[in-house]
């Protein structure tokens, strides 16, 4: 039996120096879960054109919201040849009935516990329409099959995970809808063992946990275990790490090079709307300074388009980023992803006008904002992108970062270029608001499923 695992092209795919910015962790993990007697290959359309005529007995396709239309097109092409297709990932989980129109099987949730059964059921010629993965225990996970990727086609930043879930419940984020709010952790010794298997030619490891300091006692144990590994790593954390000096010092000693931190909004009203309560009591500028003093750079995430945002939000956001010298700003437009509280509210208010999933890349306006027009939000975002990602602005940020990163600052130039490229794509987009019902697909909400059909 031969299984093809397909990563569809992402509309925001960026290449630099002939390489894709980062590889996906999803398909190497699914490949590792495939029964060992089954031949498996990974096809990443972001690095090479996809041959839709390849022989296969089963095709598995993962999809996020922005590349869901492409995933559906690929699925339709393989099904037209009589090959069973499985759709899985965040987007199919949150709109399973929509995904089922393009697949023989839809996997809801995480793959552990169900993927081997899917493969065996297809091998027997008898399968279910839907398989629901439970929240698996993270002990004993197999090592991702990085050997199935041509790693020369990606930047040398492998991904790994130490935990899943997020204790926060931001209204615009689909993470909790997919992984849940209950944090689950891998044994620290297994994380360290996986690091030892990685090709040491990498420049840094990206730890994909949504909040690596979600449980401080676990984070301390993890950071202590990373110190002897002598690696450089990048992770995601809540801003609360700035106020735990012991934990912050340990992160720096363990090789933390940068932290992606969700500031989301500069206004208390915006934070309340996002349900980011933890940020409401923190002094952003003091927290940033504390992190910088440890030699850790910040990838700062900001969202524009909340109901309390007016056209002044763009200048205020730019001025804050410039004043605090955040090394890598990541500014996005509020986007009503499926499975989120935000989407349910905007649908109920009749404010979503764009139902083309390929536009849901967080650089394009898809709804009617409260205090400005869609055109004003898009144009303001475009101005903000031009200001933050001009070459002089990038150089100024990185020159400042030299004071606490030293020569390590060189690694942040390509990342800034990635966001510059993404912003340039958005500059060509012009929103075309229509009636909020026009073009609306029949199925836009997750619905309860009976999975034993």
Model-derived features: where do they sit?
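Short, electropositive alpha-helical surface patch
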Residues: 51, 56-65, 220-226, 310-326, ...
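Structural detector of well-ordered beta-strand residues that form the stable sheet scaffold
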Residues: 86-87, 107, 130-131, 234-236, ...
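Radical SAM enzyme core and accessory elements
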Residues: 2-5, 39-42, 150-152, 341, ...
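Acidic, low-complexity intrinsically disordered segments
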Residues: 1-200
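Structural recognition of alpha->loop->beta junctions
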Residues: 98-116, 199, 250-260, 316-331
């Amino acid at each position: 039996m031969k299984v093809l695992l397909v990563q569809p092209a992402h509309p925001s795919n960026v290449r630099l120096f002939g390489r894709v910015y980062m590889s996906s962790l999803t398909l190497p993990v699914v490949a590792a879960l495939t029964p060992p007697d089954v031949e498996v290959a990974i096809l990443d359309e972001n690095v090479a054109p996809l041959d839709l005529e390849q022989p296969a007995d089963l095709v598995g396709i993962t999809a996020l919201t922005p590349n869901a239309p492409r995933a559906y097109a690929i699925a339709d092409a393989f099904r037209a040849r009589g090959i069973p297709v499985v759709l899985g990932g965040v987007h199919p989980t949150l709109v399973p009935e929509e995904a089922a129109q393009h697949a023989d099987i839809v996997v809801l949730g995480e793959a552990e516990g169900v993927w081997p059964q899917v493969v065996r059921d297809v091998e027997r010629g008898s399968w279910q329409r839907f398989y629901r993965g439970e929240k698996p225990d993270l002990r004993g996970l197999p090592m991702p099959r990085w050997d199935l990727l041509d790693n020369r086609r990606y930047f040398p930043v492998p991904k790994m995970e130490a935990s899943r879930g997020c204790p926060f419940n931001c209204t615009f984020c689909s993470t909790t809808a997919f992984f849940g709010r209950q944090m689950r952790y891998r044994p620290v010794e297994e994380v360290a063992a996986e690091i030892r298997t990685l090709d040491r030619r990498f420049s840094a490891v990206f730890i994909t946990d949504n909040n690596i300091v979600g449980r401080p006692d676990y984070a301390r144990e993890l950071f202590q275990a990373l110190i002897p590994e002598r690696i450089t790593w990048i992770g995601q954390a809540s801003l609360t790490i700035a106020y735990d000096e012991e934990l912050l010092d340990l992160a720096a000693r363990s090789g933390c090079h940068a932290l992606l931190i969700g500031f989301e909004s500069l206004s208390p009203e915006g934070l309340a709307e996002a349900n980011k309560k933890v940020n409401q009591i923190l002094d952003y500028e003091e927290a940033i300074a504390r992190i910088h003093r440890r030699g850790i750079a910040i990838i700062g995430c900001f969202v524009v388009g909340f109901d309390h945002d007016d056209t002044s939000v763009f200048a205020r956001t730019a001025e804050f980023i410039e004043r605090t010298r955040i090394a890598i700003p990541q500014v996005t437009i509020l986007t009503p992803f499926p499975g989120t509280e935000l989407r349910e509210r905007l649908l109920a208010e009749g404010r979503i006008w764009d139902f083309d999933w390929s536009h849901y890349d967080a650089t394009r306006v898809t709804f009617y904002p409260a205090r400005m027009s869609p055109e004003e939000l898009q144009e303001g975002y475009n101005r903000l992108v031009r200001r933050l990602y001009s070459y002089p602005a990038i150089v100024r940020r990185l020159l400042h970062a030299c004071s606490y990163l030293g020569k390590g600052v060189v690694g942040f130039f390509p990342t800034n270029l990635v966001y510059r490229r993404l912003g340039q794509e958005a500059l060509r987009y012009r929103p075309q608001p229509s009636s909020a019902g026009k073009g609306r697909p029949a199925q836009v909400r997750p619905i309860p499923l009976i999975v034993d059909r």
